UniProtKB/Swiss-Prot annotation:
This is Elongation factor Ts. Transmembrane segments: none annotated. InterPro entries: EF-Ts_dimer_sf, Transl_elong_EFTs/EF1B, Transl_elong_EFTs/EF1B_dimer, Transl_elong_Ts_CS, UBA-like_sf. Belongs to the EF-Ts family. PROSITE patterns: EF_TS_1 (PS01126), EF_TS_2 (PS01127).
């Protein structure tokens, strides 16, 4: 019998969203071969991420999080399949964790890369193509470099691509799959809004000058 380590089981679980015991059994049946184990789970219909993704997740909850000092706030809609699950501890914990994640990620604007508008991608490409370090390079090489940079940049904008703040060895997407496997339902991050106190408000110059004058007089 092959040596099935906890690390190997965790890796398979992160990939598939299947339960811990199912992952261990899959690794035993496949002689600890990761790809064969994934295939085994799919054949048995246990690969949660694949099996549940086609089911409608129309229930759920809207969660909120206000960071210490009340300077950052988050509203998040997380969907599941049943109201029963939405009230459960695992679901509510995930809702809270993802809300905190959003609060900690000021650059994140979209749920997934697929949600990013083409205009944003085109703008990033235009910026990258004009960088000085690419001047003089052949077009084919330039395109390859730019494609890699854009891919990285778009992932920075997508919530599910971010390392989970409480366990940076997994992404938010993998976290959702793990909890979906534990709950036994399809889970989906639908949308979110992040608020920052004073965002978009320009400080009046006269007020700023008065502040400086006040400090100088002390």
């Amino acid at each position: 019998m092959p040596d099935i380590t906890a690390k190997l089981v965790k890796e398979l679980r992160d990939k598939t969203g299947a339960g811990m015991m199912d992952c261990k059994k899959a690794l035993v049946e496949s002689d600890a071969d990761m790809e064969k184990a994934v295939e085994w789970l799919r054949q048995k219909g246990i690969s949660s991420a694949e099996k549940k993704s086609g089911r409608v997740a129309a229930e759920g909850a809207i969660g909120s999080y206000i960071h210490t000092g009340s300077r950052v706030g988050v509203l998040l809609e997380l969907n599941c399949e049943t109201d029963f699950v939405a009230r459960g501890e695992l679901f509510q914990g995930l809702l809270r964790d993802i809300s905190m994640q959003i609060a900690a990620c000021p650059n994140v604007e979209f749920v997934a890369v697929d949600d990013i508008p083409v205009e944003v991608s085109d703008k990033e490409k235009s910026i990258e193509m004009g960088r000085d370090d690419l001047s003089g390079k052949p077009d084919q090489i330039k395109e390859k470099i730019v494609a890699g940079r854009i891919s990285k940049r778009l992932k920075e904008l997508a919530l599910i691509e971010q390392p989970f703040i409480r366990d940076t060895s997994i992404t938010v997407e993998q976290l959702v799959k793990q909890v979906a496997g534990q709950i036994g339902e399809n889970l989906r991050i639908r949308r979110f809004t992040r608020y920052t106190l004073g965002e978009g408000i320009e400080t009046d110059q006269s007020d700023f000058a008065a502040e400086v004058a006040s400090i100088s007089s002390k």
